[in-house]
């Protein structure tokens, strides 16, 4: 098949030569894939509006020797609200970078595509902080990395303590005895663990209704970030900027 269709969300874009763009997209049909949009950087290009980051577009592609090329592009959903708000733009950049880091090319997953689409939609229309935490948690789950939050990850004992030890290497919480043998553990309140359980149970669309105190939000963000960075073996480029933006937002009552 020389020509085929993709229904895809653009994760990122970079310029190639004067007018071409290399896109990394995540599609329903093929998962993550790199494609080229010839001439898309030209002001009068018909492809221009459909190849921007975060856009959900329909692409017709023809096969190339090294990389497949877009022959036609139609924008299906641009999430325009994201582009005119720094908080939303940063949140969208974070989840697309996160997904790009976790998934390999050529592994389609309908649930993961739906998660990404829903997250972008919710970021475009409302406050995004719990949406980000929910996206992180559910992405870990789809990647087979959902932590054990009920029993000790080493011995299997039920955890009842109000302060909980979490070991990223073990992928879950630890009892007091097993925690003494781990060099790198994180301490969290029982409330943070219960909120994390809720992130896995509830649909992403419901999480904006979840009321969480600022201390629990801080702990939850730290827990998920530590776990994510351990498995990715790197810090994401967007997290440093997101942290600075979060601190500046505290003074005006908003956060991401």
UniProtKB/Swiss-Prot annotation:
Keywords: DNA damage, DNA recombination, DNA repair. It comes from the Bacteria. The keyword DNA repair applies. GO terms for biological process: DNA recombination; double-strand break repair. It holds the Pfam family RecO_N. The keyword DNA damage applies. GO terms for cellular component: bacterial nucleoid. Belongs to the RecO family. Involved in DNA repair and RecF pathway recombination. HAMAP family: RecO (MF_00201). NCBIfam families: reco. This is DNA repair protein RecO. It comes from Desulforamulus reducens (strain ATCC BAA-1160 / DSM 100696 / MI-1) (Desulfotomaculum reducens). The lineage of its organism: Bacteria, Bacillati, Bacillota, Clostridia, Eubacteriales.
């Amino acid at each position: 098949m020389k020509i085929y269709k993709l229904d895809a969300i653009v994760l990122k874009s970079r310029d190639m030569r004067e007018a071409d763009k290399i896109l990394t997209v995540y599609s329903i049909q093929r998962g993550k894939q790199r494609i080229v949009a010839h001439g898309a950087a030209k002001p009068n290009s018909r492809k221009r509006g459909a190849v921007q980051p975060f856009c959900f577009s329909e692409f017709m592609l023809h096969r190339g020797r090294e990389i497949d090329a877009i022959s036609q592009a139609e924008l299906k959903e641009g999430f325009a609200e994201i582009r005119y708000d720094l908080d939303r733009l940063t949140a969208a950049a974070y989840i697309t970078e996160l997904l790009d880091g976790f998934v390999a090319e050529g592994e389609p997953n309908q649930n993961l595509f739906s998660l990404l689409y829903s997250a972008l939609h919710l970021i475009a229309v409302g406050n995004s902080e719990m949406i980000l935490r929910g996206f992180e948690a559910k992405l870990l789950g789809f990647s087979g990395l959902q932590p054990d939050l009920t029993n000790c990850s080493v011995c299997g004992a039920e955890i009842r303590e109000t302060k909980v030890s979490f070991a990223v290497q073990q992928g879950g919480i630890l009892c007091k005895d097993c925690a003494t043998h781990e060099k790198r553990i994180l301490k969290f309140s029982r409330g943070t663990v219960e909120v994390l359980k809720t992130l896995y149970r509830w649909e992403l669309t419901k999480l904006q209704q979840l009321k969480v105190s600022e201390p629990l939000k801080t702990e939850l963000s730290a827990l998920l970030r530590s776990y994510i960075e351990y498995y990715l073996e790197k810090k994401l480029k967007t997290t440093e900027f997101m942290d600075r933006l979060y601190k500046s937002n505290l003074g005006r009552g908003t956060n991401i």
